[in-house]
Amino acid sequence: MMEGTYYKEWSAVLDREMEFKVYGHGGVPVLALPARGGRFYDWENNGMPDAAARLLHEGKIQLFCADSIDGESLLAGNESPRRRAEMQEKYFVYLTSELAARIAELNAPERKEKPLIWCVGVDTGAYQAVQCRLRRPRTFAGAMGLSGLYDMGRFLGSAEAVSYTHLRAHETLSDL
């Protein structure tokens, strides 16, 4: 089994600790996002680092397995659609600002310019991965969405409500 380095660090955006695990020592940084309700360790439990062991050992890629907050956003059925969308947007800001900066530090601390990150996700993680690439193309070089769920209406309500709420959440969080 491929060994990784575990991190548990504070997120100012989410106002809580977030966990992630890193495999490899350099190369193209790849941010891996879990499936619906999943955790950072799901990638390891399902054999992803072992499947990519050669690329990781040769320093061609470095894998960063992030945690999700689906239980507080998409899957938080007891919360209003607005609150779930706001949490979803906070998670996006965490991924694209805080975690992306940390990935750059860990991936190539000696480089002056930040490396472009690839993002991969499964299920709702696929949606997150594609969002990272489409909304932050200067940070993310590409995205792979595996078995993606892209209709957030099933979690957040009607398309109009989701769009409006998402845009309002984005306006609120743009100052972070």
Model-found features: residue ranges?
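Alpha/beta-hydrolase active-site loop signature
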Residues: 37, 70, 150
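Primarily recognizes the serine-hydrolase "nucleophile elbow" in alpha/beta-hydrolase
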Residues: 114-159
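Short, surface-exposed "cap/lid" segments of acyl-processing enzymes
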Residues: 24-55
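Conserved alpha/beta-hydrolase
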Residues: 56-74
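Single conserved hydrophobic/aromatic residue that forms the stacking wall/gate
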Residues: 166-176
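Hydrophobic/aromatic beta-strand patches that form the interior of the parallel beta-sheet core
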Residues: 31, 64-66, 144
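A domain-start/cap signature at the N-terminus of enzymes
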Residues: 1-28
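Alpha/beta-hydrolase active-site loop
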Residues: 85-105
